[in-house]
Amino acid sequence: MLNKLFIGLLVVAFINACGNSTKKEEPSKKGRVLEYTNTLSFLDENGNVVSTLRFEKADDPAERNQGLMDVNSMPADAGMVFYFDTEEPQSFWMMNTPLSLDIMYVSADSTIVSIYKSTTPFSDKSLPSGKPAKYVIETNAGYSISNDIKEGMKVRF
């Protein structure tokens, strides 16, 4: 009788262990969620507003290093703006960034000096500004094309 009970418990324990070993944890798909509490405007050559963007501000080293890494989605009218202490050549990459982005480099006088359109997610390729920049604006891919934003335009923060 004890033998049958012992064997029964072993069988139950074995089945339970096998059942748990095939269960896989789903990776979190949430990602980071941002608050877009600031706004900026893109201006045409006459100073008219072409588009307005809500944005999360990254103005310290930790925020700039984190950027949009692990952000899985953004509203169409939202992005992130990186503020640097000095105007100098900048270079970004897409490491750990699941979204395709438009990256706009902006000089200290608020002129867009270069734009990278529809960047490749997770890429470690360097995307240099080419000219000195004090600000970098990241938006969803296609934002600059759909809003007719071009190099030489001004940004009003």
Model-flagged regions — what are they?
Residues 2-8:
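Sec-dependent signal peptide recognition
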Residues 14-17:
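C-terminal motif of bacterial Sec signal peptides marking the signal peptidase cleavage site
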Residues 19-157:
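Compact, glycine-rich, soluble single-domain proteins
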